[in-house]
């Protein structure tokens, strides 16, 4: 009896040791296969390029770009402020140290030296082609010009709001705007936009799809054009593509780290395309026009009240994304 029990125990022990050995062998083999597979992927990954394809893609190309906060290397700074002004301001002031003077005045308002950046632009037309806003807070000074009301209004609409944009191939496709937030934005040295609305049979309504001269012209030789057409209707477009880039864009909402100060003019420019809404926005302000020194003094005096109507963010508007991002 005892011999049978010893034999059973010995058989069980041998089976256990054999199973343990087999499991260890399997684990070692799997480790070898996995590590070898990862090594092959690591070696081949620099030489492999993949592309995702989709159908009916939504509007996804952003005009915003993430950027490293310019104050990160300076621990004593908490925020940056960019003040954009036209060239004529510097020309009128004609003082090589005027920026240093303003920096000292901003310091007295709580903005440390080095946290305020002065950005010059040639004129509204030039700024419309390539607006770039990089600071935590951005304040744009625009001198009122009756002949440039439309340019000022569209520039304000562009920089005071966030947009998602996709390229448009107007030679192959018809396009329609889905709702009031959907616009076509054109930028370039000269943008002339013509449209031909289509019926359900894709025949032109009041125009011939084969003759661009019969299209309705809705923008002529503009630097920046935000086009709004009848929603839900297909349109054939004719655009001066040699000097202009057009994108299908959707307005997401306010870009709250940007404010515009209109210098002069009787009323603040209306930037709202929808006639049923109140045009005024807290970040669209106006100061009286006297001299540029007076304008800058006013900005310094009210800078903290202006900032209180804004929200800090670490994203920037870079119009280069408008031209190149898909």
From Swiss-Prot:
Q: Where is the signal peptide?
A: 1-50
Q: List the disulfide bonds.
A: 82-135, 165-249, 191-244, 196-207
Q: Which UniProt keywords apply?
A: Calcium, Capsid protein, Disulfide bond, Glycoprotein, Host endoplasmic reticulum, Host-virus interaction, Metal-binding, Outer capsid protein, Signal, T=13 icosahedral capsid protein, Virion
Where along the chain is Ca(2+) 2 bound? 177, 228-229, 231, 301
Q: Which InterPro entries does the UniProt entry name for this protein?
A: VP7, VP7_1, VP7_2
Keyword flag Calcium: yes
Q: From the Swiss-Prot or TrEMBL record, what is one GO molecular function term? A: metal ion binding
Q: Pfam families, per this entry?
A: VP7 (PF00434)
Instruction: For the region CNP motif, give the residue spans.
Output: 165-167
The compartments listed are: Virion; Host endoplasmic reticulum lumen
The answer on whether this UniProt entry bears the keyword Flavoprotein reads: no
Q: Where is this region: LVD motif?
A: 237-239
Q: What cellular-component terms does GO give this entry? A: host cell endoplasmic reticulum lumen; T=13 icosahedral viral capsid; viral outer capsid
Annotated residues that bind Ca(2+) 1 are located at: 95, 206, 214, 216
- Glycosylated residues: list them: 69
Residue ranges of the region described as GPR motif: 253-255
PTM summary from the entry reads:
N-glycosylated. The N-terminus is blocked possibly by pyroglutamic acid.
Any extra remark in the record? Some rotavirus strains are neuraminidase-sensitive and require sialic acid to attach to the cell surface. Some rotavirus strains are integrin-dependent. Some rotavirus strains depend on ganglioside for their entry into the host cell. Hsp70 also seems to be involved in the entry of some strains.
Q: Which HAMAP family match?
A: Rota_VP7 (MF_04130), Rota_VP7_A (MF_04131)
Q: Which family does it belong to?
A: Belongs to the rotavirus VP7 family.
Assembly with partners or alone: Homotrimer; disulfide-linked. 2 Ca(2+) ions bound at each subunit interface in the trimer hold the trimer together. Interacts with the intermediate capsid protein VP6. Interacts with the outer capsid protein VP5*.
Give the protein's function.
Answer: Calcium-binding protein that interacts with rotavirus cell receptors once the initial attachment by VP4 has been achieved. Rotavirus attachment and entry into the host cell probably involves multiple sequential contacts between the outer capsid proteins VP4 and VP7, and the cell receptors. Following entry into the host cell, low intracellular or intravesicular Ca(2+) concentration probably causes the calcium-stabilized VP7 trimers to dissociate from the virion. This step is probably necessary for the membrane-disrupting entry step and the release of VP4, which is locked onto the virion by VP7.
Q: What is this protein called?
A: Outer capsid glycoprotein VP7
Question: Whose protein is this, by species?
Answer: Rotavirus A (isolate RVA/Mouse/Brazil/EHP/1981/G16P[20])
